[in-house]
């Protein structure tokens, strides 16, 4: 047993001397590494099983998307889906009654969502799941950066319908402006659609469709009618011009573009827009007799 221990001790001393030699010399260390790699190669090397060669140019075969007319619908709970054209036309009255937003578009189009925060959110129609009439759909938050708990939808349309159009913006602080739709052409999923003061938000966005006059309505029931041309055409990055002088604690509630049938319901009473006094922008307006 003593001889075995002496033998083991000598072997340990030899290894210590060998390791010191390796650690003390870069050349010796490289030699050991090369010897170890050569031993591994000799034991485990096998002929290459694959062939490396120049291949033909890669070609991606993407089948063309079949363009179809669809209908984007969004309910009051924020769930959206796509209906095919025939399903919508068979059930148009039901769909128009049950859904908050109904937009006809192509499946290759984009849905444009303008929010009270002044942001524009875009969703590819192809990303919206197709569904049947009674299918629930998916939350619109799942398809965009829009957050319905912190924001609200003011205007919803499709990119195709925006081309060549002009939108009129109005905020609760009575800032108004006209903006050419090309200002909103972008591939980004979210952009700023307008500039807002602190505490302000968008209350109305409407497309100009031949109307020549505008009516502003405040939270206290004051109305101001004036020519649309008095609202400046500005960039999306501008705040706009003041549309009406507001009283203390008063806010702008809504903007109307006067069309062929300028009658609205206000507190259960009909208000004929064309009977309002035609004034100038940035006036005080007047209350309507009910």
Q: Where are the model-predicted features located?
A:
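C-terminal interaction appendages of subunits in large macromolecular complexes
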Residues: 1-290
